[in-house]
UniProtKB/Swiss-Prot annotation:
Record-stated family: Belongs to the glycosyltransferase 28 family.
Annotated glycan sites: 376
One GO cellular component term: membrane
Enzyme class: transferase
Name of the featured protein: UDP-glycosyltransferase
SUPFAM superfamilies recorded: UDP-Glycosyltransferase/glycogen phosphorylase
Organism: Verticillium dahliae (strain VdLs.17 / ATCC MYA-4575 / FGSC 10137) (Verticillium wilt)
Purpose of the protein: UDP-glycosyltransferase; part of the gene cluster that mediates the biosynthesis of the depside C-glucoside verapyrone B. Acts as the tailoring enzyme responsible for the C-galacosylation of the aglycone alpha-pyrone precursor to produce verapyrone B.
Disulphide-bonded residues: none
Topology of the protein relative to the lipid bilayer: Single-pass membrane protein
Length: 553
């Protein structure tokens, strides 16, 4: 019989979409089955993310809605992501600032939610910096879900530059000197742009009276990554950091019409999807259409399913791309005719049942932006990819998928239609055995690793119970002490946020935290012992020298 106390877990997702919330709520399926209460906090208009999960007992709003127009402007900017140019780096920083601008209101309103609902644990998306601050303010245990290993922490000597920001090489093992130097100097070369972001964040926090967060080499809270080794670069991680992915739903929508008929009639289909937010420009759409049409004409593939979001379609129409064409034989195909489904081998749509498509035996290759969910789903179902990262972690995901042997990587800036045709041909014809072998290998790894969602739930409980027990007063399973306020809510006897949960003194550190983060640099590196040994050696040498001098008098 389970006698462990039950807790209230507050899941927080703000600027992230369903890609961010779904894996977190899948972990919460397990927590809810164990008797824990799950509540969800998000921005206005995003309450729907919790709809598929009936165990979510309450939804809280911690920020304003992002208008469709603002979101489109934001992702148009992100879709021009470029590490190499001044304008590109400026756009990257502008996009990051736009996301971080939600911090003040999220920080205030999330604090209000904590005061009102008294959660025992915060489970936050990695975009929600405010959750880290609120957890610190209230001395609450915290877990953060990342799509990959977190940036700017846990440096490794064998990983050049900043983890998650590599553009050329993932490790130093086979990298050239120039590539290693390129990766290691990236932040230095980008300093003017990133300093602007740092100053913005510092100013924003100062206005709220929140001091800058101290930089640490390791996370000081539980970190769960929706990734796995095989795609993720193996590295030394502290006990507070765990790869628990791929976290995927065990069921998915069935393939209805017109997809079922289209797939039943074909054997080698290329599925194309760039996610909800990627907005391709006219040149990219034109090259993709011509590259795939050439592969179709050559008989490499016999069908194409292209899922284009409504926003992406509007851009095509606004740029009058419909006149772009691809001539094969005695026919001429335009983007407009492709979107209108006037060609029997092409199926265009604004939404596709992606899991059902990837699970279908006729899906031969997936042309993708290499977003975390798409990459995990494709590997899980054993479908090789043409990976063309567009922004953010997609760029590094594409590099990792290529290194794992399950993808051909294209550079979004300068790829050609011929390169796309060649990539499809490599996967399906010329290097078919290699890609099938690697895809089958990673499929099996992903199938086993997907069970780690239970590990994620276990770690949350473990961290929760350790946190509750390492303070003077244990609070789980007890009625909160409080006084009745004028508005009918209960408030603790203490006023300060740090005393809102009357835990008392901290008796011991987190059981998963390594001792080095609490040690001084001198003690950690045994500098004092080195100085003592050097001093002792000097004294001994001086003593021997004195004896030598005296003996020669």
């Amino acid at each position: 019989m389970d006698t462990l106390p039950k807790a209230k877990v507050l899941v927080v997702v703000t600027v992230g979409g369903s890609t961010n919330s779904a894996p977190m709520l899948e972990v919460c399926v397990i927590l809810a089955s164990r008797g824990h209460t799950i509540e969800f906090a998000t921005l206005e208009g995003r309450q729907k993310f919790a709809d598929p999960y009936p165990f979510v007992s309450a939804v809280h709003i911690v920020g304003p809605a992002i208008s469709a127009a603002d979101e489109e402007v934001h992702y148009r900017r992100f879709s021009t992501w470029d590490w190499d140019t001044a304008a590109g780096k400026r756009d990257i920083v502008d996009g990051k600032i736009a996301f971080d601008a939600f911090w003040p209101e999220t920080y205030r309103r999330l604090g209000d939610v904590v005061r009102k609902t008294r959660p025992d644990f915060i489970f936050a998306d990695y975009h929600v910096e405010a959750a880290v601050d609120v957890a610190s303010d209230f001395r609450l245990p915290l877990a953060v879900m990342w799509p990959q290993m977190p940036w700017l922490v846990m440096p490794q000597k064998y990983i050049p530059g900043q983890s998650g920001m590599q553009q050329r090489c993932l490790t130093s093992e086979k990298a050239s000197l120039t590539d290693r130097l390129f990766e290691m100097t990236f932040l230095l070369r980008s300093a003017p742009y990133f300093l602007r972001w740092l100053f913005f964040v510092r100013s924003m926090r100062k206005k709220e009276g929140v001091p800058p967060r101290q930089k640490q080499p390791k996370p000081d809270h539980l970190v769960l990554t929706n990734s796995y080794y095989g795609i993720e670069v193996p590295r030394d991680t502290p006990p507070l950091v765990h790869a628990v992915g791929p976290i995927l739903s065990e069921s998915w929508p069935a393939m209805g019409e017109p997809f079922a008929s289209f797939f039943a009639a074909r054997k080698r289909i290329c599925y194309v999807a760039f996610g909800t937010h990627v907005i391709l420009d006219s040149a990219q759409v034109d090259k993709i259409m011509r590259g795939l049409d050439a592969a179709l004409a050559a008989g490499v593939i016999d069908g194409i399913v292209w899922s284009l979001s409504a926003v992406a379609r509007r851009r095509i129409e606004s740029e009058r791309l419909s006149s772009s064409s691809s001539a094969v034989g005695d026919r001429r195909m335009t983007v407009a005719s492709m979107l209108a489904n006037e060609h029997p081998a092409w199926l265009s749509c604004t939404w596709a049942p992606q899991r059902a498509i990837l699970a279908h035996g006729s899906t031969a290759v997936f042309l993708t932006h290499a977003g975390p969910s798409s990459a995990n789903e494709s590997v899980f179902h054993g479908v090789p990819m043409i990976a063309m990262g567009v922004f953010g972690d997609q760029m590094n995901n594409a590099l990792r998928l290529e290194a794992a042997g399950v993808a051909v990587r294209l550079q979004k800036k300068d790829f050609t239609a011929a390169q796309l045709t060649e990539g499809v041909t490599r996967i399906i014809v010329s290097e078919r055995d290699d890609f099938e072998r690697e895809s089958a290998r990673l499929h099996k790894i992903a199938a086993v690793a997907s069970r780690r969602r239970f590990l994620a739930a276990d770690l949350i409980e473990e961290h929760l119970y350790d946190w509750d027990g390492r303070f003077e007063h244990q609070l789980l399973g007890r009625e909160p002490r409080g006084v009745e306020m004028e508005d009918g809510t209960s408030s603790p006897l203490y006023v300060k946020d740090a005393d809102f949960y009357p835990r008392g003194r901290e008796l011991r550190p987190m059981h998963l935290q390594t001792a080095d983060v609490r040690m001084s640099w001198v003690k950690l590196n045994n500098v004092d012992i080195g100085l003592l040994l050097c001093s002792s050696a000097g004294l001994l040498g001086g003593f021997i020298y004195m004896i030598y001098r005296v003996s020669n008098l």
